Amino acid sequence: MKKIYTVLILFFVFFQAHASYLLVPMDETQKDHLKAYGLTYWVIAQGAKADWMLNYRGGSFCFPYQQAFENECLIRGISYEVIPDAQYNKIVADIANPEVNMDVMKLETPPKVAVYSPKSKQPWDDAVTLVLTYAEIPYTVIYDEDVMNGDLPKYDWLHLHHEDFTGQYGKFYSAYRNQAWYQEQVSENEEIAAKFGFTKVSQLKLAVTLKIKEFVAGGGYLFAMCSATDSYDIALAAEGIDICESMYDGDAADPQAQQKLDFSKTFAFENFNISRNPLEYSLSTIDVSHSRNVPKDLDFFTLFEFSAKWDPVPTMLTQDHEQTIPGFFGQTTGYKKELIKSGVLIMGENKPANEARYIHGEFGYGTWTFYGGHDPADYKHYVGDPPTELELHPNSAGYRLILNNVLFPAAKKKKQKT
């Protein structure tokens, strides 16, 4: 019996000595896809390097074996496999085959993450803040004062909260102007505007918008969701033009505002019309929320498949265990495809409805990604609804797209071939 135990112990020691890699599968076998991103972030933060195996088992992660890494998998409830050198080398060789649409990206440096969000309490959650917290990825909350004080270069990746960069407070005036949270939001923004010498909040928001544009031009990574996406581009197009009515800035909007818009300044959209009705819960014709006629049981969008070896950036941003993602509403739900600039890459769309849901582009040395909708795990998230409990959605395919964007800046850059 002692000999048997000795053999088993020696086998275990031998196996561990040759079990040199820890593979985190990201296909349907994974118990918690979202926490797997946080684990990978933590691993590279410890100074190790990680492989992002694009299109291999749902976009799996792999790194040299350490007992501490395995312990973290166990603590966080993440599925993993301990594999020997030979198996790892075979996987890498299979991925390198030019006949298969796979590639390996090296993740080296954890990005410094900033979330743009007001200090005043808002009656809605923010999907990115929720998933960063759940995945245990560290982030810093910043707002207009930090941006105006020049803090953006401290960060690699910036998320824009559910924000209205036009200075119209999300056009919530009609329904919520008597609510304490709305009044607090107005007061906070007016106070910051005055602090930096602006007479209108719209002027402050434009200055912030331009600072963010500089951040992207200098090599920053911008990610925005919901109303932060189209309102950002509207603010760029309306630079120097008054598009706010008196309840928002104390005087009337420029009657020629539409004709004066400059679409050459925007990231993603062109030829849109701004909403001139100050009481309408809509900013422009970019968003499909009020024009779409898609029943819930048919509300999905499909991710495009890109060449992993030739187009690694969009391939990273679309890694998922599902290619068809359940749709979800937001103040901005999706984008009319005919209003998207020709150079913008559409990564996810509802083709029958002619709407894009997930788009990407480059500006200067940086990149931006816009993702329509408010909460991937809540089909319609209303003002005042409780936050989503991601413990109930650990395998959300829609939330994975957010985390792809967080890890994307950690990748060692390869020269894009197309």
Over which residues does each language-model region extend?
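Catalytic cores of eukaryotic secretory-pathway lumenal/extracellular enzymes that build
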Residues: Y182-Q183, G197-F198, A217, A237-G240, ...
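Helical hinge/lid and interdomain linker segments adjacent to catalytic or ligand-binding clefts
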Residues: Y21-L22, D27-K31, C62, Q66-N71, ...
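Catalytic beta-strand/loop cores that center a nucleophilic Ser/Cys/Thr
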Residues: D126, T133, D230, K260-V383
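Extracellular/periplasmic catalytic domains that process cell-envelope and extracellular macromolecules
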Residues: K106-T109, G150-P153, F215, L339, ...
